[in-house]
Amino acid sequence: MMRKPYHCLRSLGTALTLLLLPSLSSSPLLAQSSENVCRIGLHYKVLGEGTNSKSIPVLTVVQPFGPAAVGGFFPGDLITQIDGVPTTGLTKQQISELLASPVGEHLLTIVRIGSGTTARILRPSCKAPYALTERELATAFSGYSPMDQAKQQRTLSFSFESSAPFDWSQAKTFAFAPSEGEHRDLYDIVYGQIAGLLEARGLTQQANSPDLILECSRSDAEGGARLSLQVTSPSKLNQTLWSGTSSLPKGTKEAQLYARQAIPVMLQSFPYLTASQVGYTEQTSRYLYTGILYDSRDLSRIVDVEEGSPAFTAGLRVGDKVLRINGKPLSPTTVRELSSRYRNFLDETYRYRSAEAVRPEQAPWKSSDYGSIRKALEKDKYASVFSYLFFFRPYINETEQTELIFEIERHSETYTLSIAPVLRDETVFIPQ
């Protein structure tokens, strides 16, 4: 295969600059203060916006490991107040402005199924504008492992209905209808998924006198197999409080695997309806986390180490200079030069990609060429030191050992530290 010239990758400098731009939208993940870039880690929709004065925001996505997740927030939480300001009737822009205000913490009053009304603290995660997190670097160097860094539009065949008014804040317990028939194994998998999700939100599973009854059913229609989840109340058995329906693959094993993946997405906004049918943006992000923040002005400089992180535990501190990671020198240290080396790597290893893609770095690697990819990554001319973020993949590391060896300089002395990174999967499905 002829080497395809690399033309369409943005420079790493541009990519990193874009990553640091303030982002303030109707569903904010970032907030911006005058000095720092602050991350909130949540997405929301406004129920009833533009239809009446009782519109209210509901969380649709909580970013794994983000501030909202640390603060104990869950998808499906209704936000009734932000720092004492009622959210009823506010627009998306007004809610964004409240969440983006430059404060050390926000007090959010929420209504949650199973828990009623509670108040929780949301502490934004802030960093200097020149600080680069490993999350940002994994995105910038996505070509090392495209299967772990991707963003795509997904049409998941979900449909939702809600036909009876119900005070969900008063629901404390739930039970499942008996699993029977030839699809019992599928129902058991689905019920197990649902139980974990509902219990995490504060509901209790009990067989006697539950507040909610959940029942799964599989059906075959002209368009293919469908899986339906129906929620009723013993006091209103003839009325469906909430229902969700999804398509299913034909094979039994395929259907069970799909159910494991789809049910958490289907229940993201449960028990509220943000739309009858929903499209999603799938943001895939997996990388090895140590907790280091690098200086974009000199990438070898550590500008912060998250407290309690693997790097902090290993002894790395602010001001340390990283010389090598797993034997690879952290050089060059400028974004511009490192970008040039990275582009050369993508261009000169394109023959190892297994498929065409809109951007070459998005195509996966051929499994038969993993050895060649590892050899290329060892070449100093490519300066692939940040491939450590994907050290859990066989085309980066042929062993199962993910320990990272950092050689650092501190006060003119050289030290070698061993760090046990944590594999983070921050993949989310964001409803459009």
Regions found by a protein language model. Give the residues of each.
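N-terminal segment of the mature soluble domain
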Residues: Q170-R218, L338
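Conserved PDZ fold ligand-binding element
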Residues: A68-L90, T313-S339, L346-Y350, I373-L377
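Second-shell loop/turn segments in exported
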Residues: P64-F65, D83-G84, A175-L186, G202, ...
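Amphipathic beta-strand/beta-sheet edge segments enriched in Tyr/Trp
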Residues: R218-L257
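A structural "domain/chain start" motif
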Residues: L42, G50-S55, G71, Y130-I189, ...
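Bacterial N-terminal signal peptides that target proteins for export
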Residues: M2-L16, S25
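PDZ-domain C-terminal substructure recognizer with occasional recognition of PDZ-binding tails
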Residues: L30-N36, K45, I95-T139, S339-V428
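PDZ/PDZ-like peptide-tail recognition elements
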Residues: L29-V61, E97-L98, Y130-M147, Q256-E306, ...
